[in-house]
Amino acid sequence: MSHSKSSQRWLKEHFSDPFVKKAQAEGMRSRAAYKLEEILKRDRILRPNMVVIDLGAAPGGWSQQIRKQMGDRGRVIALDIVKMAPLVGIEFLQGDFRDKAVLSQLEIMLKGQPVDLVLSDMAPNKSGMDAMDQPRMMYLAELAMDFADIHVKPGGSFLIKLFHGVGSDDYIRQLRHRYKKVAIRKPLASRKRSPEVYILGDGKLTQNEVSCS
């Protein structure tokens, strides 16, 4: 199939997608907001007054959904390398969270508040070649897990998107040593042919609990 025909097929599918239509109607930045909505309703990990950090947040669909669910209580801090247009009730920090200066700025923003939930919907720009895309995805996932190790408070939660493939099973095993409950989710808004799955770690273990597990 030619590149133009493939692009036309994608565009047709995209604009006929009910979740795309719903996002447009409700003012959501992306259809990904409804993937998160389903997980939040099923697993009930969100409570009022939580502090939530959204990694790789642009264009902001997940941050919007968190703010919608929490109302005007709690804090949502969105973090991304690329610029994100402002959203009401969302604090945005632009930069690479591997950068010490960015992490220092985040600490200033947090003002000592513990983090209840870290989200990561990050994914690499896809080349279409699994041999390249999967390692890149797993690298981002490792960075997000390291970030959550440092920032999520004991008892807190971590939700991340993975591509099912090489390294994903081992990654899930690592999470089982860090959280009391680990669940794999494939929301209805996630296209069936997509390799993406969402992994939820709930009830972060303390260092003593990790040592004993």
Swiss-Prot record:
- Record's NCBIfam families? PRK11188.1 (NF008390)
Q: What's the protein name? A: Ribosomal RNA large subunit methyltransferase E
Q: Which GO terms describe its cellular component?
A: cytoplasm
Q: Name one GO molecular function term.
A: rRNA (uridine-2'-O-)-methyltransferase activity
Q: Where is this chain's protein located in or outside the cell?
A: Cytoplasm
Annotated active site: K161
**EC number of the protein:** 2.1.1.166
Where on this chain does S-adenosyl-L-methionine bind?
G60, W62, D80, D96, D121
Which family is annotated? Answer: Belongs to the class I-like SAM-binding methyltransferase superfamily. RNA methyltransferase RlmE family.
InterPro entries recorded: RNA_methyltr_RlmE, RNA_MeTrfase_FtsJ_dom, rRNA-MeTfrase_E, SAM-dependent_MTases_sf
Role according to the record: Specifically methylates the uridine in position 2552 of 23S rRNA at the 2'-O position of the ribose in the fully assembled 50S ribosomal subunit.
Q: What's in the keyword line of the UniProt record? A: Cytoplasm, Methyltransferase, rRNA processing, S-adenosyl-L-methionine, Transferase
Per the UniProt record, the source organism is Xylella fastidiosa (strain M12)
Give the taxonomic lineage as stored in the record. Bacteria, Pseudomonadati, Pseudomonadota, Gammaproteobacteria, Lysobacterales
Question: What does the record give as the reaction this protein catalyses?
Answer: uridine(2552) in 23S rRNA + S-adenosyl-L-methionine = 2'-O-methyluridine(2552) in 23S rRNA + S-adenosyl-L-homocysteine + H(+)
